[in-house]
Amino acid sequence: VSASHPIISVTGSSGAGTTAVTHTFQWIFRREGIRAQIVDGDSFHRFNRGEMQARIAEAAREGDDHLSHFGPENNLFAELEALFRGYGETGRGRVRKYLHNDEDAARHGQPAGTFTEWEEIPADTDLLFYEGLHGAVATDTVDVARHADLCIGVVPIINLEWIQKLHRDKVTRGYSTEAVVDTILRRMPDYVNYIVPQFSRTHVNFQRVPTVDTSNPFIARYIPSADESFVVIRFARPKGIDFPYLLSMIHNSFMSRPNIIVVPGGKMELAMQLIFTPMILKLMDARRRALGAPPRP
């Protein structure tokens, strides 16, 4: 944690909706003139797509049906913590990109499912923004969460998360339902041990809850819409959160606990704008003071 070089971390499982959250933050950064270094969590996988598929096949032949992208053996946890620590201390570090699809790959002139070369973060960034699977991960040897100034969890109820993953992987990646279900089953031990515990270390959690029947996510024809859901927003430290203001600004919102506000699904982006803009500006003001710069006009 560093006033001079703040870090915002958004963490969530595959299919949780972290990418949509990132788009909202990018909009805030543009509006406020903030230079953010965006870090894609997938770039800290240890193996590229082809290598990982080969490892999964080899593990299956040896009777291991639980090798996944969620656990420490297939990720660069130490390097991720080193990035967070180093950026907090100096505002610098090394990053790379993971090329998810053919469009990304074409821009970089290499195959999809591979990594770009490591590059140094420019010297003029205002903050680091991480979005991925492990933004609050902690093991016996690493603790990424402790380096983040603002840590956000995006965690739909699990049936909804599975519906979103099924639809994304089938529509955008061409997988069959059976292949996606196999992936969900294979990842379950690492999901329980490395993904779920992160949401107890976050500062704010967003949990989308559908109001339609999702009892069997594997036969769902549609992803429940925003209007068919609520978003449960939990604050780990509610002191300083202006709940009366949020309730007045977000129609049909209500509080279910002293540290939880519930908003209609269609108001999630508005809620994020109202909640995080003041937090980001506070981080930027602290950065200016630490650097001896004048305050915002």
Each PLM stretch: what is its role?
Residues 11, 131:
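Residues at the beta-strand->loop junction immediately N-terminal to the Walker
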Residues 21-22:
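Post-Walker A alpha-helix
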